[in-house]
């Protein structure tokens, strides 16, 4: 089904460079220096747990009972000045085969088999999954977060045999926080998947992340949130907002940094599309493990880091 002519009339005005935004709304980009890819350490670790668990399942040599549906959550304790201190809790829920059968048809036998399955999965998470996860972490400050008092919650509801769309309804757009920053930063509410780059729900969110990532990489701030707002049919954003959470390393105010963002980055939808090459067929990777912070991610940090750093070094001298 094609886009409504009423919407398309406002977006496609015949001037390709000034193509209007495909919808109204606010989009957020966030970055911090907690990890090498400028993502919150909580979400980065949760994604690493899931990709590693998938690798183990696909290899088919260990934890051979694994099935595709799984999710994770990592809780980290922070200091008062927002610095990660230690991992408090790791949750891993994974679908699995009925790999331990009950001795008979009684309820007691079924409960005993279910309990043994969960205990085996818990043991394998600690002895197989976690060592492989930690072996992939190169950052000493992230490794230092692991400790002997971590609470591991593995399949906390018990057995998990029925999964995927058969076990729960709906797929697209249900996990917009997992797709972005795991609760840090902000979110305008619009899902990404299923939308082309004329929809600023997707393209402007990628652009805001691109800006935030380059700002942190350039040393402007240890943490930054970039908010863009658009009106349907209008090319330029109606608002650009920046929040450095009091962790800026430059003399400029957040408002002055926002003005610098307007100067440095062309935020018209067509310009975003060109800068980030959003017409290339590269979206398959975003179907799982989030849209941001990927090694092979859509939104990559490019040479903008040097340009941002140069612009900031003159009017906003380091303090």
Question: Where do the model's predicted regions map?
Answer:
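Glycine-rich, mobile lid/loop segments that gate access to catalytic sites or pores
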Residues: 1-162, 288, 293-297
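Gly/Pro-rich active-site capping loops and adjacent beta-alpha segments
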Residues: 4-9, 18, 23, 174, ...
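Non-catalytic terminal and connector segments of soluble metabolic enzymes
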Residues: 6, 16, 182, 266, ...
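Structured core elements
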Residues: 27, 73-75, 91-93, 151-154, ...
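Hydrophobic alpha-helical scaffolding
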Residues: 39, 111, 115, 119, ...
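Short glycine/threonine-rich loop-to-helix capping motif typified by GTGT followed
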Residues: 157-173, 229-256, 282-301
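Hydrophobic alpha-helical bundle architecture
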Residues: 179, 186-267
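Conserved small/polar residues in nucleotide/adenosyl-binding loops
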Residues: 305-312
